[in-house]
Design a protein with these regions (language model features):
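Conserved mixed alpha/beta catalytic, RNA-binding, or beta-rich assembly cores of soluble enzyme
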Residues: 4, 8-291
Length: 291
């Protein structure tokens, strides 16, 4: 059954930002879990070659941010961008050679992250202005009052196949179940800000670090077991959080591919259907909007 929501009462705010450059300092190097120093590309700028549906781990990168990394120069305006931009929202480039091209928000990290078609990404420069049609915060599931919704465009939620099942539970197709022990950096923060890094996906490093998550893909819908993200991020037995993988490979210990939260509530409220196709790439294609 289709979802009964308050989507008709949501408003859309047009927010502005710019493509933020990759940053560094003169010291450069970090160290991984085994004390090995590294200097690799990661956050910020325009990152080519990685999109929803592509693997999240195994790159020569640290804190990989696919597509465009977007923020605002004013601190408070930037926090509004972080808190109000939702996965699935439309992003439009407003300046530079690629002006007019559109993409989709795929999550939050240090920046708001947006995916575009590869040929369009290659025309975008750092400093280019963008707008985000922010819609989704305040969404409620009227027949699932125990489940908190956040950071997701209501149209995308339906495109992901989330619906009310015959038993009255919230049916959620998901690609992977993630054990609570995988949760790393990001715990304790607001769940409307940045994301949660998952340990155990250190592809190419020691097998003793593996939690079997090396197969995660950008855009995967994942189930975070015993995680309560309703009013923050923390461990709570008997609770489930649903997220979308928005960032990729990390070498820094305690970090990893990260899901942006979209649903959270008591585990008994959910009916999880494991499906390898539960990914933003499938949902975007099914909604008729390609990026």
């Amino acid at each position: 059954m289709s979802l009964n929501t308050n989507a008709d009462r949501l408003v859309t705010q047009v927010l502005t930002g710019e493509v933020w450059p990759a940053l560094g300092d003169r010291h450069g190097y970090r160290t991984d879990a085994d004390g090995v120093p590294f200097l690799l590309p990661g956050m910020g700028g325009v990152t080519l070659g990685v999109h929803p549906g592509d693997r999240a781990a195994g790159y020569a990168a640290d804190h990989l941010e696919p597509g465009l990394s977007i923020r605002h120069r004013d601190e408070r305006a930037n926090m509004a961008l972080q808190f109000l931009a939702c996965v699935g929202n439309t992003v439009t480039v407003r300046s530079g050679p690629a002006s007019g091209v559109t993409g989709r928000v795929i999550g939050q990290h240090a920046y708001v992250l947006a995916d575009f078609a590869e040929e369009e990404l290659s025309g975008v420069c750092t400093g280019d202005q963008v707008t985000v049609h922010a819609r989704g915060q305040g969404l409620r599931l009227l027949e699932h009052r125990d489940v908190v919704v956040k950071n997701v465009d209501p149209e995308l939620l339906e495109a992901l196949g989330v619906e009310t099942g015959s038993a009255g539970k919230l049916v959620v197709p998901a690609a992977v179940r993630v054990p609570a022990e995988a949760v790393g950096a990001g715990a304790g923060m607001y769940s409307e800000y940045a994301n949660t890094d998952l340990m155990g996906a250190y592809a190419g490093q020691g097998e003793d670090l593996s939690l079997g998550l090396e197969g995660l893909r950008i855009g995967d819908v994942v189930v975070l077991e015993d995680q309560d993200h309703r009013y923050g991020r923390g461990f709570r037995a008997g609770y489930t959080t649903i997220g979308v993988i928005s960032t990729g490979h990390c070498r820094l210990f305690g970090h990893g591919p990260g899901p942006s939260t979209i649903l959270s509530g008591p585990s008994g409220a959910f009916d999880i259907h494991l499906d390898a196709a539960a990914n933003l790439s499938t949902a975007f294609a099914g909604s008729g909007v390609s990026v």
